[in-house]
Amino acid sequence: YSPELSNKLAPVVSPMVAMARVLRKHYGDDAKLVFIGPCLAKKAESDEIDAALTFRELREMIENKRINPSKIVPADFDPPVGGRGAIFPLSHGLLQTMEVNEDVLSEKILVAGGRANFQDALREFEQGHLEGHHLHLLCCEGCILGPGMSPYPNTSPTAQRFTKKAKIISYANRKMSDLDREQWQAYLD
């Protein structure tokens, strides 16, 4: 840990907390909010949600209740829809959702994904070697490889990562082409 660097953190909340605040504003403080995702860190991140489950835990709950996922009719998410947020699960996805250019010649943003890279970047930042740079640090290599993901049967945790990435990109492109920006903004206002 490097608590002496806490004054260098951007004064923003995580996307999970930001969405919790939007939902509380819209549905009221009595709404029960549950985060479902691949990240174990979300379980301890905030008291602004009521519970956090990993995809693996959700899959176990579904199996324990003997629910057959293939018999469930797919449905859209409740509004507000994610739009560009659909690419968040990819490595560098947060920057893409913010439409931040990662061109190494035009921006001063360094992305470090994975525990070893995270630690190395933090150490170099602490030593002053990365002066003037913003760090985007992830202990994982994107949500699609998070520790709470449900693995494909008989595969390693990192197997199928490019297939997963391609599916997310395809989904995000569909969502963006269907997004009514005026309706989306009106919902948030």
Predicted feature locations:
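Iron-sulfur-associated redox domains of electron-transfer enzymes in respiratory
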Residues: 1-188
